[in-house]
Amino acid sequence: MLAPLLFGVAAQIEAIDPELMARDGTRLRKNVAELRRMLGTDAVFCSAPHGSLATALGAPDSGDCADRLAADARVQASLEAVRQWQADASEPVVIAAFQGPSTLAAALRQAQPGLDAEALYEHLGRGLAVLVRLFAETGVHGVQFHEAAAPPPGEVDCWKDALGTAGNVARFHRVAPVLVVQDPGFKSWPAQMVACPGATQRSAALMRPHGQALSGDPQHWPEALATGPLEKLVTTTEEVPPAHELPGLVQRLARLKGA
């Protein structure tokens, strides 16, 4: 399944600000759906990783985050887009993409240094599980967690526990939980996640179905796509920049697919 993380770039279709599109479920659905039609990709994204998620989740001492997540404008718009896709006769594959717990932990520590790792990751795991449940019950087919960097060595177990909490909720709802990590040297893929390694992150021990992560910059995509027998998904390490020009994106995807 070819599914580069294309979201904000869809706002070019209507010539509106990507942030405005991300807060309007109908515009989100129309523009992202039209982008999929133009490019011939295999999935649509109802959300992309964004810094507002850390604010909605809050620190461990901020209490239950369920109400804050449900009230978040971007979350509400994404869920509304999923509902509209549910009524779409074409029934596209819908994926929700979020920041992962390591990225969220780093953001929360910028605002509140010294947060205890165990308490922080436990809080993030519960919060991401709530988020996954919201999207799974609304009708997404997959959730992707994108990490800007791997967790510090001393926090790997806490990080894996947080991913496991969210991943268990996804699997309960029969939604694929995917992990993408930008760190080129990262190879310690948690069993709870569908790994999506980049070219330098593949491991001989990865003998289960997994994906492949291309660069978030289409200029760095290969001339032709090559996938192994266990690679079921091709996405990108991060969101394709919203300012990337659509004509060039059409050409890059056509070359990638060998068209």
Model-inferred region functions:
Residues M1, G40-A43, A89-V94, G139-H141, ...:
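Short, well-ordered coil/turn segments that N-cap beta-strands
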Residues M1-E80:
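Alpha/beta catalytic barrel-like cores
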Residues E14-L28, Q110-R126, V130, G211-G216:
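Active-site mouth loops of central-metabolism enzymes
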Residues R27-G51, V130-G142, V169, M193, ...:
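Catalytic domains of carbohydrate-active enzymes, especially glycoside hydrolases
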Residues H50-A54, G58, I95-Q112, T138-A162:
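Active-site-proximal loop/short-helix segments
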Residues T55-L134:
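Active-site-proximal, glycine-rich beta->alpha crossover segments in alpha/beta enzymes
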Residues G63-V93, G154-L179, D183-G185, L256:
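Alpha-helix-loop-beta-strand connector modules within alpha/beta enzyme cores
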Residues R174-A259:
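Catalytic-face loop-and-helix region of soluble metabolic enzyme cores
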